[in-house]
Swiss-Prot record:
It is an enzyme of class 6 (ligase). GO terms for molecular function: asparaginyl-tRNA synthase (glutamine-hydrolyzing) activity; ATP binding; glutaminyl-tRNA synthase (glutamine-hydrolyzing) activity. Its EC number is 6.3.5.-. The keyword S-adenosyl-L-methionine does not apply. This is Aspartyl/glutamyl-tRNA(Asn/Gln) amidotransferase subunit C. It catalyses: L-glutamyl-tRNA(Gln) + L-glutamine + ATP + H2O = L-glutaminyl-tRNA(Gln) + L-glutamate + ADP + phosphate + H(+); L-aspartyl-tRNA(Asn) + L-glutamine + ATP + H2O = L-asparaginyl-tRNA(Asn) + L-glutamate + ADP + phosphate + 2 H(+). It comes from Pseudomonas fluorescens (strain SBW25). Heterotrimer of A, B and C subunits. Belongs to the GatC family. Pfam families: GatC (PF02686). Keywords: ATP-binding, Ligase, Nucleotide-binding, Protein biosynthesis.
Amino acid sequence: MTLERSDVEKIAHLASLGLNEDDLPQTTAALNSILGLVDQMQAVNTDGIEPLAHPLEASQRLRADVVTESNNREAYQSIAPAVENGLYLVPKVID
């Protein structure tokens, strides 16, 4: 899969990225290079290979899952400017 200049412009627009005209050729080449690497990895035969969760066979000593702090929800919400049904109300940011 290769991307054209128009594809990169559309992706940049959808991601709200501001790309200069001078940056488009370099960005297109970089994205095509990444996609080429992904294509190479997808071409590798992985039949019979068990998925790997972690490269090292090590286990971690974990602490006990115990509640260590008290519930201060009401105290925190009592000083909030706007709360409804236990949720903080905030101004709308995105139109």
